[in-house]
Amino acid sequence: MSKKNDWLDFDQLAEDKVRDALKPPSMYKVMLMNDDYTPMEFVIDVLQKFFSYDVERATQLMLTVHYRGKAICGIFTAEVAETKVAMVNEYARENEHPLLCTLEKA
């Protein structure tokens, strides 16, 4: 006579659980959007302050925002991306600029 739980493969269940636990986290692109009012110097400041770019790379990204309408500032896990978006948007509002920082799934 067979055991009651022959139909369950406990080893496979354990492997599936471990595999699920080891999946890499979802990643998100943090982007700056162009507007007609935020000074270029402020965008450079944001890129240096919140994304740790040197002045040269920050200037390149600022020009991408200016000419293409948006630029990816970095790719992060959900929690980090959400925090950076919130911090940049709050900083822009505190300085009375309409600069918009957004995120989207990478």
Curated annotation (Swiss-Prot):
It comes from the Bacteria. It holds the Pfam family ClpS. GO terms for biological process: protein catabolic process; proteolysis. Binds to the N-terminal domain of the chaperone ClpA. Belongs to the ClpS family. Involved in the modulation of the specificity of the ClpAP-mediated ATP-dependent protein degradation. This is ATP-dependent Clp protease adapter protein ClpS. The gene is clpS.
